[in-house]
Amino acid sequence: MSKSAATLTHIARTAEVSPSTVSKVLNGRSGVSAATRERVEQALRSHGYSPPAERRRQPFIELVFERVDSSFAIEIIRGVQSAAVARGMSVVLSETGNRHTPGPEWLNQVVRRRPSGVVLVFSDLPAAAKERLALRGIPFVVLDPAGDPAPDVPSVGSANWSGGVQAARHLLELGHRSIGVIGGPQDMMCSRARVSGFRAALDEAGVPFRADALRWGNFLREDGLRLGRELLQLPDPPTAIFAGNDLMALGVLEAARMLGLTVPRDLSVVGYDDLEIARWSGPPLTTVRQPLAEMGEQAALLALDAQDGAVRAARVDLATSLVVRESTAPPSAR
């Protein structure tokens, strides 16, 4: 009997299950109850079980989005692909279906596929999921985590707070004092950080933050359109709007057009991301650039280096920069 077979037999006895059940758990197959799966995984941990190297690695990185439907996703894919190709690997995409936390079926599939590393975008991983991935030697990195990641969760992001500061200072330097803000999802750390940085810059300049002109969207163009109309139809509409991403900023541009306003003569608009579409909007969009491709590349390298046993920083934040185009100008006299 081989050493691995004997080990599986010992684990099966400890967990009071059959060796085939242990095999199902190791390979992420269905047909095992949650309670039994937990019992087997506890036995695996207590025995210090490590699957054979040829079963641990497949030459690809799994890149996980809530949904792959935007230029934002394309930029991240480019970065991850660059890192993968440099290591002789490919990239597999999967979706969690508009959920920050991947479900158990996704986790089972990842265990079956055995990628060399996993990069999750806008995600929170529960402790049980982290343990299952670690048990199978699958390193993971969260890119732009939805919440504040635990110290043991490697993550990559951009300097979101500083990006908010840069957007606010630009509008303040142009002379704007009545500014609306459309943040991204309020439960996402990056959204809150951008709004917090923006507000801090206003406080520093002694300019009141308009709580009545703050809205929260879902990073969608439709949100920018709807919430932009709300802000622009206030009794005292803002002279400028900072949107938490470029897609919502494009929605604000459309809202202004629908209300007969000209950008930037009647309204200044600042976005966030610097997607390619920002250069071709009408007018070209002033925005805060976060290096999405570089973020994807760094996240992939973190995961692959962890697979190779290298130890790197658990948190990487890349710098943002303001890109001034034609959607901002000094406020017109009213």
What are these regions (language model features)?
Residues 227-230, 234-334:
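Flexible loop/turn connectors
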Residues 19-24, 55-69, 76, 170, ...:
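Short beta-strand segments enriched in small/hydrophobic residues
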Residues 35, 65-75, 93-102, 145, ...:
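Hinge/beta->alpha junction and helix N-cap segments in small-molecule ligand-binding domains
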Residues 177-178, 209-213, 263-268:
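Short acidic capping loops at alpha-helix termini that bridge into adjacent secondary structure
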Residues 1-58, 332-334:
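N-terminal helix-turn-helix DNA-binding module of bacterial transcription factors
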Residues 114-122, 180-182, 214, 235-245, ...:
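Periplasmic-binding protein-like
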Residues 1-3, 59-169, 173, 233:
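Alpha-helical recognition/docking segments in bacterial nutrient-uptake
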